[in-house]
Amino acid sequence: MAILGLGTDIVEIARIEVVIERSGERLARRILTDAEWAHYQQHQQPVRFLAKRFAVKEAAAKAFGTGIRNGLAFNQFEVFNDELGKPCLRFFAKAAELAEQMGVRHVHVTLADERRYACATVIIES
């Protein structure tokens, strides 16, 4: 295994809250997959949930070395938890194609939040 990419991101949770207050659920709908949207709607702290997902997806795009552009979109990355609660990442559409082209076989995700910030790191390996 070799590290193909590493990305990290930090998000000010209040910034996400302001966007939600201003534009309703448009940001969440743009960022989240259908499965994530279902969790978001049921979550006791939806702003924190969205901030953490945003951070993971930004970190993943950075790990790919592309950022969110050229057909890559936030909702092509899906954050889910394994049976032990560990965060994991699935790829769809252009993100899945890029992962295949790069030879991605393993993805490591960590995320955290504290009062004001959410942060995430993503490592992709061959």
UniProtKB/Swiss-Prot annotation:
This is Holo-[acyl-carrier-protein] synthase. It comes from Pectobacterium atrosepticum (strain SCRI 1043 / ATCC BAA-672) (Erwinia carotovora subsp. atroseptica). Mg(2+) binds at residues 9, 58. The gene is acpS. It is an enzyme of class 2 (transferase). It catalyses: apo-[ACP] + CoA = holo-[ACP] + adenosine 3',5'-bisphosphate + H(+). Signal peptide: none annotated. GO terms for molecular function: holo-[acyl-carrier-protein] synthase activity; magnesium ion binding. Transfers the 4'-phosphopantetheine moiety from coenzyme A to a Ser of acyl-carrier-protein.
